[in-house]
């Protein structure tokens, strides 16, 4: 049995990288032309309900409770009932198993 010397492998990453760069440049040119062509044709009208949803609202967050929690954390007086946390975790795990 004889072992013949083989030619070293030439990586093709340099070739594929060049092809990727050329493709990206073409895509940028085409994308810019399409963006310029479409810029004046687009308009959006929001309904009154959508405008209300976009506006920030304090009704979603109990600001007073958040302030109390922040103060308790800062003072170091916040107490946590670990049994309630454990019960909620077990309940949630049981619900996810039965679904």
From Swiss-Prot:
Pfam families: FlgM (PF04316). GO terms for biological process: bacterial-type flagellum organization; negative regulation of DNA-templated transcription. Coiled coil: none annotated. This is Negative regulator of flagellin synthesis. It comes from the Bacteria. Responsible for the coupling of flagellin expression to flagellar assembly by preventing expression of the flagellin genes when a component of the middle class of proteins is defective. It negatively regulates flagellar genes by inhibiting the activity of FliA by directly binding to FliA. The keyword Transcription regulation applies. SUPFAM superfamilies: Anti-sigma factor FlgM. It comes from Proteus mirabilis. The keyword Zinc-finger does not apply. Belongs to the FlgM family. Keywords: Bacterial flagellum biogenesis, Repressor, Transcription, Transcription regulation.
């Amino acid at each position: 049995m004889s072992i013949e010397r083989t030619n070293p492998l030439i990586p093709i990453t340099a070739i594929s990288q060049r092809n990727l760069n050329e493709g990206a440049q073409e895509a940028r040119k085409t994308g810019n032309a399409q963006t310029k062509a479409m810029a004046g044709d687009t308009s959006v009208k929001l309904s009154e309900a959508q405008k209300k949803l976009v506006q920030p609202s304090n009704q979603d967050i109990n600001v007073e409770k958040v302030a109390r929690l922040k103060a308790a954390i800062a003072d170091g007086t916040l107490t946590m009932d670990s049994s309630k946390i454990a019960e909620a975790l077990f309940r949630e795990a049981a619900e996810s198993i039965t679904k």
